[in-house]
């Protein structure tokens, strides 16, 4: 690749690009995915054929192909990738739930009582297998991220209650099997954001929006919180996550601060990659927590944050250096809410389209 004039990324060694041709290439072992103008991409593969034996195909509008087990296609609006209905049917069949009654949400909040009876060996094996399949699916179905994260935390010793939650998620999956991840501009409040440095549409200037949220002490057993986030490049959704925070937050403000730190790390990774490609990048971080935003904008620990580890205050330095701009978003508009807890149907129906799922 280097001999052909392509630059290899330092932060992500799977990425290559050629700025003179405006071609980007992602390498996964012996699978390649290249983007650019049709003629340039064709010339790239023909040149590569001189060095290695390969099969390649140009994906045109309304074409379909498979890359890393995912079905890829392009329509008049955007780029679509999905695991397809067949994968969902396989999971339902494995769980013997092909005839199960569908439900409208991925899960419900824990009740006061739960069945903590451990699963037997066969049930445990089935649980691990299905949850693993759901985790793979969740890369394209961000509405499943929180539920699969919670189920995966119980892989070592699942109970009857965990199996009940798994069945609920599978019933939701049955009712939403046709949802696809479509990479196209989404209707979010981000597009109204003021660019702090230059014109919004200046050539090679991009804005990264990272929306974050947390659910303070959401785990009844450990009292740990969950961080969630979604990363958009301009108005295009690119990444999302749901993670249990590694330490116990002593307040909701602290939990929100940790969520902002996690979101900043995700955004800066992509910003650095884009800057390697000679783009100018601005990072806006959105939170619905006034106290969390206040902690991010100050320098040093407040009276209630003196116990927080030093590494988390790197966020404050990023803000002070204008490497990242904190922004307030209304809680009801925050898509990251879906990554932190089970939500009611009305919230799910409103926010799910902002994830690129349609």
Predicted regions and their residues:
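Long, low-complexity, charge-biased intrinsically disordered regions
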Residues: 1-358
């Amino acid at each position: 690749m280097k001999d052909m004039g392509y630059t290899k990324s330092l932060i992500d060694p799977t990425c290559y690009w050629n700025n003179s041709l405006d071609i980007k290439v992602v390498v996964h072992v012996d699978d390649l995915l290249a983007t650019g103008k049709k003629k340039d991409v064709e010339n790239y593969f023909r040149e590569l054929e001189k060095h290695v034996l390969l099969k390649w195909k140009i994906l045109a509008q309304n074409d379909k192909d498979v890359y890393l087990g995912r079905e890829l296609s392009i329509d008049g609006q955007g780029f679509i990738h999905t695991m397809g209905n067949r994968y969902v049917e396989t999971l339902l069949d494995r769980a013997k739930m092909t005839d199960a009654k569908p439900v409208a949400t991925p899960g419900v909040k824990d009740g006061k009582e739960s069945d903590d009876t451990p699963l037997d060996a066969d049930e445990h094996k089935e649980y691990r297998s299905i949850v693993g399949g759901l985790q793979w699916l969740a890369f394209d179905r961000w509405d499943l991220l929180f539920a699969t994260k919670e189920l995966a935390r119980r892989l070592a010793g699942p109970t009857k209650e965990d199996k009940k939650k798994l069945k609920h998620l599978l019933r939701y999956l049955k009712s939403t099997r046709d949802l696809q991840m479509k990479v196209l501009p989404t209707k979010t409040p981000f597009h109204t954001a003021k660019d702090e440095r230059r014109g919004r549409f200046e050539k090679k200037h991009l804005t990264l929006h990272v929306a974050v949220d947390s659910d303070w002490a959401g785990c009844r057993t450990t009292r740990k919180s969950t961080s969630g986030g979604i990363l958009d490049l301009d108005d295009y959704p690119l990444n999302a996550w749901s993670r249990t925070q590694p330490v116990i937050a002593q307040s909701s403000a602290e939990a929100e601060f940790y969520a902002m730190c996690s979101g900043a790390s995700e955004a800066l990774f992509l910003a650095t990659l884009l800057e390697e490609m000679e783009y100018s990048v601005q990072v806006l971080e959105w939170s619905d927590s006034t106290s969390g935003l206040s902690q991010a904008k100050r320098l040093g620990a407040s009276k209630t944050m003196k116990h927080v580890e030093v590494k988390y205050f790197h966020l404050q330095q990023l803000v002070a250096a204008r490497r990242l701009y904190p922004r307030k978003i209304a809680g009801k508009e925050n898509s990251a809410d879906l990554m932190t807890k089970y939500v009611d149907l009305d919230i799910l129906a409103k926010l799910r389209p902002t994830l690129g799922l349609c």
